[in-house]
Amino acid sequence: MAGNRSIITLECKTCKERNYTTTKNKKKTQDKLALSKFCPRCRKHVDHKETK
């Protein structure tokens, strides 16, 4: 059985490119995930938000 973790995609807030995939626990983290990651298109660290 898979469990409570689901695969999500992280999208750059400035250029809207989907750069990263990760997993998150649906029960413990119900709100949208936002992380500061490096965007190769923008060539700098930018906030990335969760998309489906």
Swiss-Prot record:
List UniProt keywords, sorted A-Z: Ribonucleoprotein, Ribosomal protein
What cellular-component terms does GO give this entry?
cytoplasm; ribonucleoprotein complex; ribosome
Its lineage reads: Bacteria, Pseudomonadati, Myxococcota, Myxococcia, Myxococcales
Gene3D superfamilies recorded? Ribosomal protein L33
Q: Has keyword Ribonucleoprotein?
A: yes
Entry-linked HAMAP family: Ribosomal_bL33 (MF_00294)
Q: What InterPro entries is this protein classified in?
A: Ribosomal_bL33, Ribosomal_bL33_CS, Ribosomal_bL33_sf, Ribosomal_zn-bd
The GO molecular function terms of this record are: structural constituent of ribosome
The UniProt entry's sequence similarity note says: Belongs to the bacterial ribosomal protein bL33 family.
Concerning NCBIfam families, the annotation shows: PRK00504.1, PRK00595.1, rpmG_bact
Q: What organism does the UniProt record list as the source? A: Anaeromyxobacter sp. (strain Fw109-5)
Asked if the Swiss-Prot or TrEMBL record annotates the protein with the keyword Lyase, the reply is no
Question: Biological process GO annotation list?
Answer: translation
Protein name, per record: Large ribosomal subunit protein bL33
